[in-house]
From Swiss-Prot:
UniProt-listed GO biological process terms: xenobiotic detoxification by transmembrane export across the plasma membrane
Record region (Disordered): 1-25
GO CC list: membrane
UniProt signal peptide: none
Upper taxonomic lineage: Eukaryota, Viridiplantae, Streptophyta, Embryophyta, Tracheophyta
Principal location: membrane
Gene from which the chain derives: DTX27
Protein name per the record: Protein DETOXIFICATION 27
Length: 486
């Protein structure tokens, strides 16, 4: 088995590092270059879509089992998952995204041993961040009471939050491992691990909830068990022979350069968190409208549909980041530019397909979620905004992937802060309450004032980018980070 993986890894490295402009010099036409780049891209995007959908499904299954226990249990688990875990998940995932820059560029430069060192540094940084974030779980009950949640929901949410702590620490290993493998084009391994974890999750949910009747604690424990199964599979594969070039064992070298690594990780975390929290603010603002129940229900349905579809652009985010980082690390600025064009174009085509689909089925898309006439009518009215949100999201995450692959995280963090919170939120508030447009005004203001402006700025930066200069910066970055361990 390991021999096969070695051959596959060797072939992947050759395919991954062969640049588009080299193909052109060999006499291949534009069509051949597009096909080659598409194959490289979808070797990352395809498994990434599967892994993300599988992980998302584990959460849905957990909430489905919780719903059979009672409304109180469902409310408690939903609050902890969406608020406490959601907050920490976004921050830690963003911090781990620094590896997409460093590992991707190091792999492109053929400095393979550095990938293992970078991953160990990420483990250290994320572990200490996890420890610092523990109060968000320990003090869940008093925080929810302070925010006005009913006492019974706040008390049970506090119990749920404590039992989610093992999941919290699973993120420490899981996120760096995923990016470590992703940058080597070993995404099929993460897909297989996610599939096994999903099967385990379904079986353990049935055993703990229906079989052993462990209630809400058993329901929460299942998600932690499933995540740790996933982590152990990835860890064993990565450290026990699956990655012989990039994993050379635990090293004291990982203890050097931690401050620089922390700064890049923090920039990545802030960049993604500002996006993640933005849409949570949308739901909170909607909850303060008149007829809030209908507004929140309809918006939640739209967000659920958008969430499923977002798995595709987020996979392109991962794929684009790796491809751009690999090409820049190899000193191929033209290849990075070509990879960006191919990725944005293909993601946009998929986005246009879903845009048309939502526009055609605007009065039917909510049937699977609700039978309430009022909710169905509200979703129908919101479907136009949903369609344009899906369309914008087919481009924006891909451009963010370009930023990650190029190491622009700190700049994008400032752009996100300005667009989302200085333009989008105030405009949403003005349109929602000032112009009395309700949830349509809030969503419209935040989408066209925040997301659209951010997308235009990122598009402008990407189009004006000097890719050869970025390749030189990548080379300097690799040499700098390599020198920190000498």
């Amino acid at each position: 088995m390991r021999g096969g993986d070695g051959e596959e890894g060797s072939e992947s490295r050759v395919a991954l590092l062969k640049s588009p402009h080299t193909a052109e010099e060999d006499g291949e036409g534009l069509k051949d270059r597009i096909l080659v780049e598409t194959k490289k891209l979808w070797q990352i995007v395809g498994p990434a879509i599967f892994s993300r959908v599988t992980t998302y499904s584990m959460l849905v299954i957990t909430q489905a089992f919780a719903g059979h226990l009672g409304d109180l249990e469902l409310a408690a688990i939903s609050i902890v998952n969406n608020v406490t875990v959601g907050f920490n998940f976004g921050l830690l995932l963003g911090m781990a995204s620094a590896l997409e820059t460093l590992c991707g560029q190091a792999f492109g430069a053929k400095k393979y041993h550095m990938l293992g060192v970078y991953m160990q540094r990420s483990w250290i940084v994320l572990f200490f961040c996890c420890v610092l974030l523990l109060p968000t779980y320990i003090f869940t009950t008093p925080v929810l009471k302070f925010l006005g949640q009913p006492d019974d929901i706040a008390e049970l949410s506090g119990v749920v939050a404590i039992w989610v702590i093992p999941l919290h620490f699973a993120f420490t290993l899981s996120f760096p491992l995923q990016r470590f493998l992703q940058c080597q084009l070993k995404n099929r391994v993460t897909a297989y691990a996610a599939a096994v974890a999903l099967v385990v999750h379904i079986l353990v949910c049935w055993l703990f909830v229906d079989g052993l009747k462990l209630g809400v604690v058993g329901t929460v424990a299942t998600i932690s068990i499933s995540w740790w199964v996933n982590v152990l599979i990835l860890l064993v594969y990565s450290t026990c022979g699956g990655c012989p070039l990039t994993w050379t064992g635990l090293s004291s070298e990982a203890l050097t350069g931690l401050w620089e690594f922390l700064k890049l990780s923090a920039s990545s975390g802030v960049m993604l968190c500002l996006e993640n929290w933005y849409y949570r603010i949308l739901i909170i603002m909607t909850g303060n409208l008149q007829n809030a129940r209908i507004a929140v229900d309809s918006l939640s349905i739209c967000m659920a549909i958008n969430g499923w579809e977002m798995m595709i652009p987020l996979a392109f985010f991962a794929g684009t980041g790796v491809r751009v980082a690999n090409e820049l690390g190899a000193g191929n600025g033209k290849g990075a530019r070509f990879a960006t064009i191919v990725s944005v174009t293909q993601s946009l085509i998929i986005g246009l397909f879903f845009w048309v689909l939502i526009m055609l089925l605007h009065n039917q898309i909510a049937w699977i979620f609700s039978s309430s006439v009022a909710v169905l009518d509200a979703v129908n009215k919101l479907s136009l905004l949903l369609a344009f949100t899906v369309l914008l999201n087919s481009v924006q995450p891909v451009l963010s992937g370009v930023a990650v692959g190029s190491g622009w995280q700190s700049y994008v963090a400032y752009i996100n802060l300005g667009c989302y919170y200085c333009i989008g939120v105030p405009l949403g508030f003005l349109m929602g309450w000032g112009f009395k447009l309700g949830v349509m005004g809030i969503w419209g203001g935040m989408i066209f004032g925040g997301t659209a402006v951010q997308t235009m700025i990122l598009s402008f930066i990407t189009m004006r980018c000097d890719w050869e200069k970025e390749a030189q910066k990548a080379s300097a970055r690799i040499n700098k980070w390599s020198n920190t361990i000498k």
